[in-house]
Amino acid sequence: MISRKALGSLVCLSAVATLIWIASGNWKVHYLPYYLPCPGIFSKKLQYLGDKPVQLFPQLFYQQPRVLAPKRQDVLTVTPWLAPIVWEGTFSPEILDSAYMPLNLTIGVTAFAVGKYTRFVSRFLKSAEMHFMKGYRVNYYIFTDNPKMIPDVQLQPGRRFDVVHIKKYSSWQEISVRRMEAINLHIAERSHREVDYLFCLDIDMVFHNAWGAETLGDMVAAIHPGYFNVPRSQFPYERRSSSAAYIPDGEGDFYYGGAVFGGLVKKVYEFTKICHMTILADKANGIMAAWQEESHLNRHFLTHKPSKLLSPEYLWDDRKPKPPEIFLIRFSTVDKNYQEVRN
């Protein structure tokens, strides 16, 4: 038996088809002030599992955006595939927070403190509490081979950090390539139930200015501070064709840093899984890519373009002088003796 609702939909569709057939003939078209009684079609609202309901922007007062007067004319603010590049002056934190705050999001952060890198945990967390996603719930996941060396840092309400015990490896290169695997397993086992977005950051870095909702996106990559103003022929891509991270000469958009990436937790899960698989393929062939997981990250983003790019403001190197294009530095590496901390 056909239900009354289904029968109503069929009648509605039949009426629409009849009107189209009439209009397509040679008859003169008349526009009638008549609306078909099809409320069942238009009243359906689907909410997929895990999705947050769309929020309306509240009434805000801000300067009118001007089409012919962009705030930034000195830098590229959108990629050829229409992904925004986030620079200071290209967004309004107030407008973004008015949209994202009502969603009650939880933002996750993974960082690896292995070996001597535990010394950077306290400064990383204290600076994050001052600048990272203020007003949002945040879960910090600190991966370490020595949980006893992780300090207890006072966090704001609604924010917590968990220590994730991982295996100790013999070299920093092995630690580097194992990072994708560890993040992927943690998402599968736990964090996919706990966070909406996940950022994967290096622990030997410090927040200096606000890092907020402007960084949220499906899949987010950060432009490397060492290569944002040079031609791609100078990018340190993996150039051996035998590697799964291989990028031929003449290809590539930007050089992305491995110290910062993130996005929706389900997107980060897929990304880390693919990168881990390509790393395993190289390992089976006795190959380690030029810059370990960073090389595989760049290869992936060549064919799977990120939906949002963060300017070098979000991944700076304190040893470099600040160029005029960088209005402020939000997140930067700690000056250190790499040989000493990696031994």
UniProtKB/Swiss-Prot annotation:
Biological or metabolic pathway of the protein: Protein modification; protein glycosylation
Record-linked SUPFAM superfamilies: Nucleotide-diphospho-sugar transferases
Note accompanying the cofactor annotation: Binds 1 Mn(2+) ion per subunit.
Active site: E294
Protein's membrane topology: Single-pass type II membrane protein
Spans within the Lumenal topological domain: 28-343
GO molecular function: globoside alpha-N-acetylgalactosaminyltransferase activity; metal ion binding
Entry binding sites for substrate: F112, A113, V114, G115, K116, Y117, D202, I203, D204, H224, P225, G226, Y227
Residue ranges of the TM segments: 7-27
Cellular localization per UniProt: Golgi apparatus membrane
Binding-site residues for Mn(2+), renumbered to this chain: D202, D204
The EC number(s) this enzyme carries: 2.4.1.-
Cross-referenced InterPro entries: Glyco_trans_6, Nucleotide-diphossugar_trans
Keywords: Glycoprotein, Glycosyltransferase, Golgi apparatus, Manganese, Membrane, Metal-binding, Signal-anchor, Transferase, Transmembrane, Transmembrane helix
Glycosylation sites: N104
One family name in Pfam for this protein: Glyco_transf_6
GO CC list: Golgi apparatus; Golgi membrane; vesicle
GO biological process, one term: carbohydrate metabolic process
Cross-referenced Gene3D superfamilies: Spore Coat Polysaccharide Biosynthesis Protein SpsA, Chain A
Top-rank lineage group of the source organism: Eukaryota
Keyword Cell membrane applies: no
Cofactor: Mn(2+)
PANTHER family referenced in this protein's UniProt entry, alphabetically: GLOBOSIDE ALPHA-1,3-N-ACETYLGALACTOSAMINYLTRANSFERASE 1, GLYCOSYLTRANSFERASE-RELATED
Similarity field: Belongs to the glycosyltransferase 6 family.
Note on domains (UniProt): The conserved DXD motif is involved in cofactor binding. The manganese ion interacts with the beta-phosphate group of UDP and may also have a role in catalysis.
UniProt name for this protein: Globoside alpha-1,3-N-acetylgalactosaminyltransferase 1
Biological classification of the source: Eukaryota, Metazoa, Chordata, Craniata, Vertebrata
